[in-house]
């Protein structure tokens, strides 16, 4: 094998007839005898010869062959080979190439050209930094036959075609100094393999033939051309128009960064999705953050443009304006900057519990938009209301607090209210409603609907006693874009001391004089959005008997707001302080039936056993003289006087207490409202409460 085609690729104008000494091996009849060791070829205008089994014979000028580093250096005394004895060329990603070699690697060739994977990438050392070198990549056809894929393996399949004339790729950075080639690995990522002679600088290969890439390092810039060839047998491949071996396909999909779309969802690495890195862990706050923040006065707040970007490095970019426990750019143990809303790029695990943000700042200060005090590690490392500007909406709390002296001393050191429950919303939520950073553009601040919010740059103390803000959204559905307080999209644990989940005025729900927080936070509530409290709403459930009696209260907030109320707080929300008045403690989350005994038949009398010691208990007190036992029979779809109503009176031995009279008979002594919404009747007047069938939805 001669190197005339190599040198012609380097310098096409040089005449090379009869004065090239070649290093044989690896191609033609040599059969790869010289593979594994580079051959150095000198073009000095005097010697001529031919390759013999990988050993180059140079005539004239005292050939000296010396082994060095596992490759042959061939040349006359005083030749430039003496300068390149320390030359080393190594293949990068050799382990990956070996994995493909074990499977018989395949490379796709197309009409328009297809890039290789793995990419031939080499590292050079020992070059003369001041000398000029050209790097070439040659694809040598190493077999004299074709290949075919039969029964899961490659077997010889016929005579080989004539190899292309010039499958040599010149590195686009050639020629260049040795210092340039040694600076970083030399990559042939732009090589394109084709099966057509389109002449676009692409490498033409014959399909179903095996090739071996070889790197040629040519020293240029002098009269004598010096070629060093490095074959890499582990890079051999068969050119194909479509992958034959499925294992090769899987391996390429696994390691090729441009083929990640073919991966299954469970196999895709988290780093493919940058928005996942915006979510951090919710970690319980240590006490030293609260102590350190109480003694630090916050500097003037930054503008949105200064504090908008995500800071992923540590120390942070804004360390000059930050105040930390120890230094300006201090970091906690998880690599996050304490003085900015930074996001560690490696924290890609989605958080295992719901995230609820109270207030505008992620560190719990309701009016401090810059939040330059050290934020506890339990702060959700997410772009909160400040970073929601990138999604198309600017929250009101940021725009109002970035104008003036919001970052004052009273707004620091108040982490206990926001992070007492590891990042969940506390009971005393700030009047500035929460803004959740969903990756969309429809969120808005609750201040738009909140009548109790503080407008303008008015300082607010987070630690002061604050009212619970009521939800004043004009739309009672949870699909409303303005419904931003305690979003029901997250399943909030029923033990968390967050404010009333539905933020509805309690006077509207229960008809009592007790409101949320004494009624101070219920201003501006849309009274017309919910049913009046003086009427009865009858809505039977499939699991309840059809003769149950319902008291004079509307459906409570879960049903009125069209939630699936059976799963919220497991029907025992009153035990955890969800409902603010005493009468609500006995109401169930879905419908409000009386607690009746288990009747064996719907028409048997039932016993009402409910006593309360509040102002509403008067309606449950029994008549001291007599009790009324009624039997309700409904045969038609409307309440008429023709119904058979049997009224029995019996004197009770225990007139002042509740108890079963006997045989399942019970005393019914609860005044109830008529189904159609009429006012409640007197305590000694009874009306059958089985509703008309036409009202059953």
UniProtKB/Swiss-Prot annotation:
GO CC term (a single one): chromatin
Highest taxon of the lineage: Eukaryota
Region annotation (Disordered) ranges: 1-60, 316-407, 462-488
GO MF: DNA binding; DNA-binding transcription factor activity, RNA polymerase II-specific; protein homodimerization activity; RNA polymerase II cis-regulatory region sequence-specific DNA binding
Compositional bias of kind Low complexity: 316-330, 352-373, 381-401, 469-488
Subcellular location: Nucleus
Compositionally biased tracts (Gly residues): 20-35, 50-60
Entries under InterPro entries matching the protein: p53-like_TF_DNA-bd_sf (IPR008967), T-box_DNA-bd (IPR046360), T-box_sf (IPR036960), TF_Brachyury (IPR002070), TF_T-box (IPR001699), TF_T-box_CS (IPR018186)
GO biological process, one term: cell fate specification
Record field: compositional bias (Polar residues): 337-351
DNA-binding region (UniProt annotation): 96-264
Keywords assigned: Developmental protein, DNA-binding, Nucleus, Transcription, Transcription regulation
Function (record text): Required for the specification of the hindgut and anal pads.
Protein name: T-related protein
Source species of the chain: Drosophila melanogaster
């Amino acid at each position: 094998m001669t190197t005339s085609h190599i040198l012609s690729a380097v310098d096409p104008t040089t005449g090379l007839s009869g004065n090239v000494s070649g290093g044989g091996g690896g191609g033609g009849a040599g059969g790869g005898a010289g593979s594994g060791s580079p051959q150095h070829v000198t073009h000095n205008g005097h010697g001529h010869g031919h390759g013999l089994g990988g050993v180059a014979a140079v005539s004239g000028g005292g050939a000296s062959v010396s082994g060095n580093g596992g490759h042959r250096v061939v040349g006359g005394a005083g030749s430039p080979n003496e300068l390149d004895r320390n030359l080393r060329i190594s293949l990068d990603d050799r382990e990956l190439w070996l994995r493909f070699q074990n499977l018989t690697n395949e490379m796709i060739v197309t009409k328009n050209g297809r890039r290789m994977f793995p990419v031939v990438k080499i590292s050079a050392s020992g070059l003369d930094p001041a000398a000029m070198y050209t790097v070439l990549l040659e694809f040598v056809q190493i077999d004299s036959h074709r290949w075919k894929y039969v029964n899961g393996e490659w077997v010889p399949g016929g005579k080989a075609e004539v190899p292309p004339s010039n499958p040599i790729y010149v590195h686009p950075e050639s020629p260049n100094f040795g210092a340039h080639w040694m600076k970083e690995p030399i990559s042939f990522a732009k090589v394109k393999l084709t099966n057509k002679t389109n002449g676009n600088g692409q490498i033409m290969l014959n399909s179903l033939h095996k090739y071996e890439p070889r790197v040629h390092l040519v020293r240029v810039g002098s009269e004598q051309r010096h070629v060093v060839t490095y074959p890499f047998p582990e890079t051999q491949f068969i050119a194909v128009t479509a992958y034959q071996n499925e294992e090769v396909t899987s391996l390429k999909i696994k390691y090729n960064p441009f083929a990640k779309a073919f991966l299954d969802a469970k196999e895709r690495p988290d780093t493919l999705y940058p928005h996942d890195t915006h979510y951090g862990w919710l970690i319980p706050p240590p006490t030293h953050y609260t102590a350190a923040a109480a003694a630090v006065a916050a500097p003037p707040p930054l503008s949105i443009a200064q504090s908008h970007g995500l800071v992923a490095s540590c120390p942070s970019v804004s360390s000059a304006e930050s105040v930390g426990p120890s230094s300006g750019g201090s970091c906690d143990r998880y690599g996050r900057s304490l003085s900015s809303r930074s996001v560690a790029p490696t924290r890609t695990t989605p958080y295992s519990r719901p995230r609820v943000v109270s207030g505008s700042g992620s560190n719990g200060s309701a009016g401090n938009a810059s939040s330059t005090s050290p934020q506890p590690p339990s702060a959700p490392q997410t772009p909160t209301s400040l970073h929601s500007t990138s999604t198309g909406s600017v929250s009101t709390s940021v725009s109002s607090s970035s104008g003036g002296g919001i970052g004052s001393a009273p707004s620091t050191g108040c982490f206990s209210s926001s992070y007492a429950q590891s990042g969940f919303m506390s009971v005393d939520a700030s009047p500035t409603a929460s803004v959740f950073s969903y990756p969309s553009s429809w969120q808005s601040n609750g201040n738009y609907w909140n009548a109790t919010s503080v407008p303008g740059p008015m300082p607010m103390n987070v630690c002061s006693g604050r009212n619970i803000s009521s939800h004043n959204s004009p739309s009672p559905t949870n699909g409303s874009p303005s419904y931003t307080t305690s979003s029901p999209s997250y399943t909030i644990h029923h033990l968390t001391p967050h404010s009333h989940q539905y933020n509805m005025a309690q006077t509207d729900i229960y008809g009592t004089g007790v409101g949320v927080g004494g009624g101070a936070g219920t201003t501006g509530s849309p009274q017309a959005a919910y049913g009046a409290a003086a009427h009865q709403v009858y809505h039977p459930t499939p699991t309840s008997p059809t003769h149950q009696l319902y008291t004079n209260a509307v459906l409570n907030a879960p049903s009125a707001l069209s939630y699936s109320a059976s799963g919220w707080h497991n029907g025992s929300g009153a035990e955890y302080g969800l409902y603010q008045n005493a009468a609500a403690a006995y109401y169930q989350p879905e419908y409000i039936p009386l607690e009746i005994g288990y009747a064996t038949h719907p028409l048997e009398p039932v016993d009402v056993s409910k006593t309360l010691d509040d102002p509403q208990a008067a309606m449950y007190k029994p008549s001291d003289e007599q009790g009324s036992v009624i039997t309700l029979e409904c045969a038609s779809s409307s309440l008429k006087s023709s119904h058979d109503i049997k009224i029995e009176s019996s004197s009770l031995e225990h007139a002042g207490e509740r108890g079963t009279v006997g045989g399942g008979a019970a005393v019914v002594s609860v005044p109830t409202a008529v189904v159609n919404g009429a006012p409640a009747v007197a305590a000694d007047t009874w009306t059958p409460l089985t509703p008309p069938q036409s009202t059953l939805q």
